[in-house]
UniProtKB/Swiss-Prot annotation:
<feature type="transmembrane region" description="Helical">
    <location>
        <begin position="581"/>
        <end position="601"/>
    </location>
</feature>
<dbReference type="InterPro" id="IPR032394">
    <property type="entry name" value="Anoct_dimer"/>
</dbReference>
<feature type="glycosylation site" description="N-linked (GlcNAc...) asparagine">
    <location>
        <position position="854"/>
    </location>
</feature>
<feature type="glycosylation site" description="N-linked (GlcNAc...) asparagine">
    <location>
        <position position="847"/>
    </location>
</feature>
<dbReference type="GO" id="GO:0005229">
    <property type="term" value="F:intracellularly calcium-gated chloride channel activity"/>
</dbReference>
<dbReference type="Pfam" id="PF16178">
    <property type="entry name" value="Anoct_dimer"/>
</dbReference>
<dbReference type="GO" id="GO:0005254">
    <property type="term" value="F:chloride channel activity"/>
</dbReference>
<feature type="compositionally biased region" description="Low complexity">
    <location>
        <begin position="978"/>
        <end position="991"/>
    </location>
</feature>
<feature type="transmembrane region" description="Helical">
    <location>
        <begin position="906"/>
        <end position="926"/>
    </location>
</feature>
<keyword id="KW-0813">Transport</keyword>
<dbReference type="InterPro" id="IPR007632">
    <property type="entry name" value="Anoctamin"/>
</dbReference>
<dbReference type="GO" id="GO:0042734">
    <property type="term" value="C:presynaptic membrane"/>
</dbReference>
<feature type="region of interest" description="Disordered">
    <location>
        <begin position="501"/>
        <end position="523"/>
    </location>
</feature>
<keyword id="KW-0106">Calcium</keyword>
<dbReference type="GO" id="GO:0034707">
    <property type="term" value="C:chloride channel complex"/>
</dbReference>
<feature type="compositionally biased region" description="Polar residues">
    <location>
        <begin position="49"/>
        <end position="59"/>
    </location>
</feature>
<feature type="glycosylation site" description="N-linked (GlcNAc...) asparagine">
    <location>
        <position position="839"/>
    </location>
</feature>
Length: 1002
């Protein structure tokens, strides 16, 4: 059944024949040929007869008399392939029609056995009406094929109908014979000019017109500055044609067959680039129906039902081919997808041309994000160096390291731990100052403004790219892309109708197009989706609870391991370092494992919801995956930053878990140093292992596995296997493109590491920058060399990812405010310096933060056994703001505690509002649309109107010239006839002087 609305479409320009369901001929089924072969009409000269109207014997004689034969790409080289050499491996075998898209499927037959001939001569292709010589039964080289099983037969019939409907839409197909017992078949699709023109007009694709104009750079100063920058950055520019003339731009206008005179069509075969051609074919594939496959709509449904294995556009040749032959893929590899060109800018225009706007915007965003990491990395290094430079001048660190200050500290554990001097923690205190100093407050404010400036500049770059890439007015295309329902959604609707109405509902569904029937019974309501929503809610809560449980398990590991190591005198001195390092590594391994699990769970939960369109599916998948991975990655960090050491208790009244294990507490210098260690290991580990090793190693392992599988797979010997493979074979062996969600997700999580806890780890932007320099080339190499070519998708922005980035930027302000106020000692130092210090300095700050405890009040069985402390201890110190034992309310929170707590809350409020105000101010000061782009858009609209009117005037003028010439010839003939009769006319007064005159002589 042909697709609705696509009947009676001329297949080729100038062809009088209309393609209908009867014109698709089938190959004869001889006694030894059980497979039907699809014949597709090919190029014919005007007046050429259609073979479909001839008798089969006449067809056979006509085909046998042809000079050329279209052969299989694996045919024996002894048979001459064609009178012409192959132009490229991206064309049909007639060397004329370009392969715009490829459908691949795997077939299997039973009971096949070879005839008497060599299998190398048994292959032929019936392609677009041009065939090789007919092989009659009993001839050498025949392949006797057994019957297909029921499932394979059903799939074959569905493929035949779908391919017939594609031809009814005007596409031209070429496919190979299923000559072996099993194997892969590639259906090559070519879109002729009239199909490209029709679909381009339907999709409103903007194409360049004849008119070009210069993009002005602004005033003279701006021009000079731009010229200087271009000269200085010339070594960093990729050597691609797009950068040679970037000051000129074509006016673009939606394609219209009635206004062909507007466009600069020099050659129809190359007017639409490869990405646009494949995009047009993909649109046809998505809306072509197949009634045998339960009236499913589109190629995605057929792939989901295993009718086809894959569908993909071809790459532009090989990226590592020898010689000087250049194509866009090879150019991208040389100037972008190699680690040796890491210092160069990205050829964004060429990326967009080859992969489409969606992938082009991703790499543009990644490039801008990486470039913005440079100033933040410089400031972060300066902050770190400031901490290094001022470490000798830090008064609290000097007091802690001073052995004359006899601060006898309470035991860190029960029984086995002894009293200890605070000066033994000198190294921890000095290291904490590297990250806990006044400069980190400034850096937190800077990073909050940095995030705002990054998002604002991205909006500006997005508008600039939208102008150069003609993405204005793309909303209609996005709405059209949402019209196609997902195969799973159609299946659920069909199951619903089957349950409600039985066979009558199925008949109704087959009689009406799924796109046209909008009744409630033909779509899923909230009642149908409620079980899925309930499952989603319960599963997400379970996953979050699982993450928290694992974090708690690691906490228990830290507590029990610390207690066990404290029993041994040899390991007692390194307990804190050992426990911290091993716990962070465990956290990292768990995060990496759960990341993979949560990604699969998020996809499964989204499928349960049964979203209608691909865009809705992608948005819901992104939200679920981000929520689960965010909780997974940051839960251990949130624990160290805000909860560790807050529920320890005090000497004599410690908090215990599992009846004997004390809750862990922070180091004497605070938890900020441990937070820094946790952040650095998790961030670097994720980037090194997950983002790089997995991305490099896993594809290589998959490729090796496929290669070993192909070598060990049983099958018939193929004598042509040593021949150079075709491009569709090479692309089929690549990994399928699965979307940009993993690429964005890893960068968004990294963005969170850079912004959320930057107050505790100012070097995070440096490590992110180093990772991204590699990440850009790693992703580029993956897209160019390891993935099948994605379908070109037009989009004007990065979608929901921008909202997530904006949310993280706002959330980071709150998190950094609490890190500075709660985790660091910045606020206690300010309170002491301006409220309790006698001389306005930090002298005496350490003593101010330590409380007294009477050791005689320790619980029975918790005192140190065999204490070797060199002096008798009456009072020990612990870090907290509590009343001394001799106070009326011993061990209660002191007045200093409430003063510090009030100052911390006040700082959070002031910091948050100040940074938010500055962020809004920066947002207001930086316009979303650059002024020059706004002016150029207005100018382009004016130029387009002028150009359109001028071309219309020229068209009318050219159309009027033949009429004027014909009218002028008639006037001259009439004047000559009047001149011949003039003498007699003038002798008669009152006669008409001329036949063309409307006046009389009176």
């Amino acid at each position: 059944m042909a697709a609705p609305g696509l009947r009676d479409i001329p297949l080729l320009p100038g062809s009088p024949r209309r393609l209908s369901s009867r014109t698709v001929a089938r190959g004869s089924q001889g006694p030894k040929h059980g497979q039907q072969y699809l014949k597709v009409p090919g190029h014919r000269a005007p007046g050429q007869r259609d073979n479909s109207s001839l008798h089969p014997s006449q067809v056979s004689r006509r085909e046998s008399s042809r000079d050329r034969s279209v052969i299989n790409n694996y045919l024996d080289a002894n048979e001459p392939p064609s009178s012409e050499a192959r132009l490229s491996r991206m064309h049909f075998h007639d060397n004329q029609r370009k392969v715009d898209y490829v459908l691949a499927y795997h077939y299997r037959k039973r009971g096949a056995h070879l005839g008497h001939g060599s299998p190398g001569h048994s292959l032929a292709v019936i392609s677009n009406g041009e065939t090789g010589k007919e092989r009659h039964g009993g001839g050498p080289g025949d392949v006797e094929l057994g019957p297909l099983d029921a499932l394979e037969e059903e799939r074959r019939e569905q493929r035949d109908e779908f391919e017939h409907n594609l031809m009814a839409a005007g596409l031209e197909l070429e496919k190979d014979l299923e000559s072996k017992s099993q194997g892969s078949v590639f259906v090559r699709i070519h879109a002729p000019w009239q199909v490209l023109a029709r679909e381009a007009e339907f999709l409103k694709i903007k194409v360049p017109t004849k008119k070009m104009y210069e993009i002005k750079a602004g005033g003279s100063i701006a021009k000079k500055f731009s010229a200087i920058l271009q000269t200085l950055s010339s070594p960093l520019q990729p050597r691609v044609p797009e950068h040679s003339n970037n000051r000129m731009k074509n006016l673009s206008y939606p394609f219209s067959r009635e206004k062909m005179y507007l466009y600069n069509i020099q050659e129809k075969d190359t007017f639409f680039d490869n990405a646009t051609r494949s995009r047009i074919v993909h649109e046809i594939l998505k809306r072509t129906a197949c009634s045998r496959a339960n009236n499913t709509m589109g190629i995605n449904s057929l792939i989901a039902n295993n009718i086809y294995e894959a569908a993909y556009p071809l790459h532009d040749g090989e990226y590592d081919s020898p010689g000087d032959d250049m194509n866009d893929r090879k150019l991208l590899y040389q100037e972008w997808a190699r680690y040796g060109v890491f210092y160069k800018f990205q050829p964004i225009d060429l990326i967009r041309k080859y992969f489409g706007e969606k992938i082009g915007l991703y790499f543009a965003w990644l490039g801008l994000y990486t470039s913005f990491l440079i100033p933040s990395s410089v400031i972060g290094v300066i902050v770190f160096l400031y901490g290094c430079a001022t470490i000798e001048e830090d008064i609290p660190s000097k007091e802690m390291c001073d052995h004359q200050n006899a601060f006898t500290m309470c035991p860190l554990c029960d029984k086995s731990c002894d009293y200890w001097n605070l000066s033994s923690a000198c190294g921890t205190a000095r290291a904490s100052h590297l990250f806990d100093n006044p400069a980190t407050v400034f850096f937190s404010i800077f990073m909050a403004l940095w995030a705002t400036m990054f998002l604002e500049n991205w909006k500006r770059l997005q508008m600039r790219l939208g102008y150069f890439w003609d993405l204005t007015g793309i909303e209609e295309e996005e709405e059209r892309s949402q019209e196609h329902s997902r195969p799973e959604y159609e299946t659920k609707v069909r199951e619903k109708l089957l349950k409600e109405s039985g066979k009558s509902a199925v008949q109704k569904l087959e009689a009406n197009s799924p796109e046209d029937d909008e009744d409630d019974e033909d779509k899923l309501t909230w009642k149908d989706r409620f079980p899925g929503y309930l499952m989603n809610f319960a599963s997400i809560l379970f996953m979050i609870a699982l993450t928290f449980s694992i974090v708690f398990g690691v906490i228990v590991y830290r507590i029990t391991t610390a207690a066990a190591l404290s029993l041994n005198k040899a390991t007692r001195s390194n307990v804190r370092v050992t426990v911290t390092a091993t716990a962070v590594i465990i956290n990292l391994v768990v995060i990496l494992i759960l990341d993979e699990i949560y990604g699969a769970v998020a996809k499964w939960l989204t499928k349960i919801e049964v979203p209608k369109t691909e865009q809705t599916f992608e948005e819901r998948l992104i939200l679920k995956a981000f929520l689960l991975k965010f909780v997974n990655a940051y839960s251990p960090i949130f624990y160290v930053a805000f909860f560790k050491g807050r529920f320890v208790g005090r000497p004599g009244s410690y908090v215990y878990v599992f009846d004997g294990y004390r809750m862990e507490e922070c180091a004497p210098g605070g938890c900020l140093m441990e937070l820094c260690i946790q952040l650095s290991i998790i961030m670097l580990g994720k980037q090194l292992i997950q983002n790089n090793i997995f991305e490099i190693g896993v594809p290589k392992l998959k490729k090796l596995f496929r290669k070993l599988k192909d070598e060990t797979e049983p099958g018939e010997s193929d004598p042509d296997h040593s021949k150079r493979p075709e491009q569709w074979d090479l692309d089929h062996s690549l990994e399928p493109y699965t979307g940009l969600t993993p690429e964005y997700m890893e960068m968004i999580i990294q963005f969170g590491f850079v912004t959320l806890f930057v107050a505790s780890f100012p070097l995070a932007p440096v490590f992110a920058l180093l990772n991204n320099v590699i990440e850009v080339r790693l992703d580029a190499k993956k897209f160019v060399t390891e993935l099948r070519r994605p379908d070109a998708v037009r989009t004007k922005d990065i979608g929901i990812w921008f909202d997530i980035l904006s949310g993280i930027g706002k959330f980071s302000v709150i998190i950094n405010a609490f890190v500075i106020a709660v985790t660091s000692d910045f606020i206690p130092r300010l309170v002491y310096q301006y409220s309790y210090s006698h001389n306005g300095t930090l002298h005496g700050f350490v003593n101010h933060t330590l409380s007294f405890f009477n050791v005689s009040q320790l619980k029975e069985g918790t005192q140190p056994e065999n204490s070797q402390f060199d002096q008798e201890v009456q009072f020990c110190r612990f870090k907290d703001y509590r009343e001394p034992p001799w106070a009326p309310n011993p061990y209660e929170f002191s007045k200093q505690y409430w003063s510090v707590l009030s100052a911390r809350l006040a700082f959070v409020i002031i910091f948050q509002n100040l940074v938010m105000f500055l962020s809004v101010l920066v947002d207001w000061m930086i316009p979303d649309i650059p002024t020059d782009i706004s002016d150029q858009i207005k100018k382009e609209k004016s130029l387009l109107v002028d150009f359109f009117l001028k071309e219309e005037h020229e068209k009318v003028k050219l159309a009027d010239e033949p009429t004027q010439r014909s009218q002028g010839g008639g006037d001259r003939s009439r004047r000559s006839r009047a001149a011949s009769s003039a003498p007699s006319g003038r002798s008669q007064p009152g006669s008409i002087a001329s036949s063309g005159s409307q006046h009389t002589n009176v």
